[in-house]
Amino acid sequence: MNKSILTAVIAGLIGYGSAFAQLTASQAFVEAPRSVLPLLDRNARLDMLDYFNGGLTTKTSNKLNGSSAVTAVSPEQIAVQMTDASTCHMAVIPAANDTLVAVITTIATPAPDSKMTVYSSDFARDLTSSVFSKPTLRDWVTDGSSLATV
């Protein structure tokens, strides 16, 4: 009897702890809706992670009839070569009330062009404007009056 109670308590604690487990970048990559990663369906993303975790360099077909591959994974970040000319990086960021998911997509034009979007952990809300301010020209230019004349 005591053994079954102890087993039930341990199972409950494990379940309780896993309910609050930290979201990983791999989980976010798999669970992202198609609106976030339109080139890859969920099964393709699962395959890509399996290939990467298995040490394979196998690429997966994407919706543009090209190929995509996971190139790096850590608990906090995942990097994906989406096409020959684009990448996607996802990072999970612990916050006070939720884990945020930052998605940075980059297109390799002559000067790489990136876009960052920050989502709630369930991807239900775009939180970019509340957690990130785009730099303005003034942020990049110094005040000329503070420079010494040469």
Residue ranges and their predicted role:
Residues 100-133:
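Mid-length scaffold segments of soluble, non-membrane domains
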Residues 127-150:
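Short aromatic loop motif centered on NTY/YTY
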Residues 90-96, 149-150:
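Structural signature of eukaryotic scaffold interfaces centered on beta-propeller domains
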